[in-house]
Curated annotation (Swiss-Prot):
SMART domains to which the protein is assigned, alphabetical: Ribosomal_L2, Ribosomal_L2_C
Keyword RNA-binding among record annotations: yes
GO cellular component, one term: large ribosomal subunit
Name this polypeptide is given: Large ribosomal subunit protein uL2
Any one of the GO BP annotations: cytoplasmic translation
PANTHER family, per database record: LARGE RIBOSOMAL SUBUNIT PROTEIN UL2M, RIBOSOMAL PROTEIN L2
Alphabetically ordered keywords of this record: Ribonucleoprotein, Ribosomal protein, RNA-binding, rRNA-binding
Annotated Basic residues bias: 50-59, 269-279
Function: One of the primary rRNA binding proteins. Required for association of the 30S and 50S subunits to form the 70S ribosome, for tRNA binding and peptide bond formation. It has been suggested to have peptidyltransferase activity; this is somewhat controversial. Makes several contacts with the 16S rRNA in the 70S ribosome.
Family, per entry: Belongs to the universal ribosomal protein uL2 family.
Oligomer and partners: Part of the 50S ribosomal subunit. Forms a bridge to the 30S subunit in the 70S ribosome.
Keyword Iron included in the entry's annotation: no
Pfam families from the UniProt entry: Ribosomal_L2, Ribosomal_L2_C
Amino acid sequence: MGIRKYKPTTPGRRGSSVADFTEITRSTPEKSLVRPLPKKGGRNNTGKITTRHKGGGHKRQYRLIDFRRHDKDGVDARVAEIEYDPNRTARIALLHYVDGTKRYIIAPNKLSQGDFVEAGANADIKPGNNLPLRNIPVGTVIHAVELRPGGGAKMGRSAGASIQLVAKEGRFAQLRLPSGEIRNVDVRCRATVGEVGNAEQSNINWGKAGRMRWKGVRPTVRGVAMNPVDHPHGGGEGKTSGGRHPVNPNGKREGRTRRPNKESDKLIVRRRRTGKNKR
């Protein structure tokens, strides 16, 4: 993937850039692997806003991604297409299995149209192959890692993400995550070899607010800039600091909200790098 920069023909174009999509081989998705994706606008079933700054955006179809692949152990698949997916930053690869099945997977770096991939304990260590952690050599870069055996890939799914297998001790494998955290994961959990492609995604300059609106992202307005009816931090004469600890529009305290007693925290060997308002 490369990035194409625009000339400053308008204020919105100045400094903006876009992916060149050179790796994309097909512009329309496989019809059997898409589902409708109704807009929710960040609201739940009662109409209450549960996620702010969401709404609008271009119409999308959801691509069904195979995050497990355990039911295709030992079945070879050919990479038929590399496609764009509007629902994630990574590209997706359309696999044609020799038994006639078609599936989408996250497209790792260096996976090209026409390559062959497989899943299973005896698969080779090459990009796109899916194996249990116990069968992957220490030091290998992986992505799409399960947290629980058979639970489907949960970690390392976004563009450019890579996880390194740093050690194996007993029934656990130690993984170094992109955040710097080192975590124990059951060796029966599966992962895909290689790093996720489209790593240049993070270098794209969106250029104008309108491009974010196309993605369904609405403006983020500070509470202190609102009226008292709209936010607990609103109002006051002149500019104010809010006068209280940071809260959300409902009055619930915000900031450092990570649970210190989450059940899975006992599997963390070394916590992620910390900074202001992080744990």
